[in-house]
């Protein structure tokens, strides 16, 4: 019997025997019962001649019936295996010949334990009129929405039919809204069936759905923005004219051209746990990027880059997550270089290095999760989520740019994406592709032959730190040095802080300045923290990137005037980038307030964020 060796340790499915080629989802979105209910049809191809069982991933699902080629089939749901859910085993009437397909229809409903869906009451939305729901399936949460081969090593095309009383978005191209049904009871709304097609094969974690009181506006020739009606104008003003230059910039670096037809942005409610999620056709984005000054929209450059790295060429397992995020961070910074100049690219990398330092220090420099390629057997991929695959992954690629020279490296980039488009790969595929591409280039071939690949993939801790262009950070560090001298030599310092110190800066320069300040923040008095925030307007800023870092410095300094504003910020944003570090700092400053703040806001957070913060605050005792 021939089998493929499964590369993904975080799936219970037997995807090496059967592989999904097309997924059809037909669900009703029931806001009242907070569930999706309907059916899923999987068209699966046999990779062997002998296997009679199909095993799918499932997690907290209510599966009531299964048909195989329209005939009722026996199935069983195994014991739950944390953190992967329960294997769903379907008995086929007979083994399917290799290369032939079988159609499996499952009648299914989600349950209250679903980890991918967040359901929001009207009170949790901006206009407080209608409920709202959205999904977040990365890393392995699609299995809590529908039984599937929940592994990035499998890609299928998708069809969506989603019935809802409110507008729906899904990770495909919209094909219409029809089949109106009147309300089933007084006071309820009638429903429409919204349909979408995704002709490009995608991984299960890119399955996305959102429904709520949504409106849209154009922001470019290939792009629209969607948000709540009240925020729409503000979102449009922030993003209008910004997307197409990003797209033109990246299309000058990679190949093939943009494959997904439209690039739209959904600005989610503030509880969304990530900066963005690269769902095809619709990037999901945090409202924290809408700062009124167009200073935080680099998140869009990042998610757009995922249209190539992650979505078109996908890491085959979460152990090789750097292939998604390292490439994407690299491409995001290349976009910045094209649009704003190389000094901006280097400036972003300097900010990234600080994030890398924080993650490595938190884990410890010899921790397995600080490696580029990690071992996730028996582990939860969410536990390994940090800036390391982003930033250490970026440095892996930047290392090759420096090693081979930018011109040669730039010839490889489009070749890589053309070679692996529509496929899932691991780090060894990347290595083989790079070596093969330069096989006839004597100089490059010699450098790659001498390169320490084992160190790149498996060494924990820091990558080599390159020399960055310091142009944009010099003034940030200089001002931080003045503050440090003021703090330690108050009487002899002639430095008088003034708003003009930062008047000419872009907001990310304030970010770098505040991150430098954090390195000695515990030496600040409460009065000096007040002076810092008041003088530079950091205590009143609408820019969450800046505000969160100022408040973090205040928490490090144990300055009580920053405690309540920190708690308030934690009650209005669910992005884990801000929430998790701030809870850790607030706990050290005032554990009682940290716990009270979490208990007050835990239902506001997405289940993934809530689970992570619980681990941060309580360890595993809450399980």
From Swiss-Prot:
Q: Name one Pfam family in it.
A: Peptidase_M1
Its annotated compartments are: Cytoplasm; Nucleus
Which GO molecular function terms does the record list?
Answer: aminopeptidase activity; epoxide hydrolase activity; metallopeptidase activity; zinc ion binding
Q: Which cofactor does it need?
A: Zn(2+)
What does the note accompanying the cofactor annotation read? Answer: Binds 1 zinc ion per subunit.
Keyword annotations for this protein, in alphabetical order, are: Cytoplasm, Hydrolase, Metal-binding, Metalloprotease, Nucleus, Protease, Zinc
The chemistry this enzyme catalyses reads:
an epoxide + H2O = an ethanediol
Q: What does this protein do?
A: Aminopeptidase that preferentially cleaves di- and tripeptides. Also has low epoxide hydrolase activity (in vitro). Can hydrolyze the epoxide leukotriene LTA(4) but it forms preferentially 5,6-dihydroxy-7,9,11,14-eicosatetraenoic acid rather than the cytokine leukotriene B(4) as the product compared to the homologous mammalian enzyme (in vitro).
Can you say what this protein is called? Answer: Leucine aminopeptidase 2
